Amino acid sequence: MYRLFCNDRCLKANNFCEDLLSVDNKEIRNSDDIVYKILDWLYDESQPCLDLGDVDGRDLAYAVKTVFRQAPAAGGVVIIDNQFVAIERNGMADLPKGHIERGETPDVAALREVEEETGITDLEIINELPSTWHCYLLNNQWTVKKTSWFLMRTCSGMKNIPQTEEGITKVYLIDKQGVADFEKKTFASLKTLVPEIVLSLK
């Protein structure tokens, strides 16, 4: 299922052809109705959820391309001693992540961002986790951010060197008992990752 978050509100659909987002395809799709539904949902904050059901995945992809500017990002869930690394960013519980730079692959960007935001080095990717999607209004342009997530480990241990220029004030570890508290204090899009995180903790 495709889920796109706007703060605590969610757009969801059963079908989504993500590959079409990166293709300059001139194919004409009948996506105007979906575009209008998305825009109505974005500007009407009284709508908590927009469920597009079994909409054609290609039509939805073209609608997303029409409505949003794309800003891909990548991040990591770092496991240390059966705990995971979290950060406090602008007062919210978060995971280390950031924009993918030109020429970078998501995995390389994730390793770089985690090290920059936490100070943790010698990182190794174990496997890929589900991506999250959220959107926001920036300079009068709706932007969609797909964040590619990776499960990681390190042989150098925990460090607490927050990247303060990015609004990060704290780097800390959370065990399985602390997951519920993290979930209360984090973003709606990240809550979808919690089951995967729990599976990674013994």
Which residue stretches match the model-derived regions?
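Charged phosphate-binding loop/patch that engages nucleotide di/tri-phosphates or the phosphate backbone
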Residues: 189-202
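Acidic, metal-coordinating catalytic segment for phosphate/diphosphate chemistry
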Residues: 32-75
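Short hydrophobic/aromatic beta-strand or adjacent loop that forms the aromatic wall/cage
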Residues: 1, 73, 145-149
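N-terminal leader/capping segments at the start of a protein or of a new domain
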Residues: 1-43
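Unchanged
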Residues: 99-190
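Active-site beta-strand termini and strand-to-loop segments that position acidic
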Residues: 78-81, 152-154
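Conserved Nudix-box catalytic region and its N-terminal flanking loop in Nudix hydrolases
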Residues: 21, 28-29, 79-115, 120
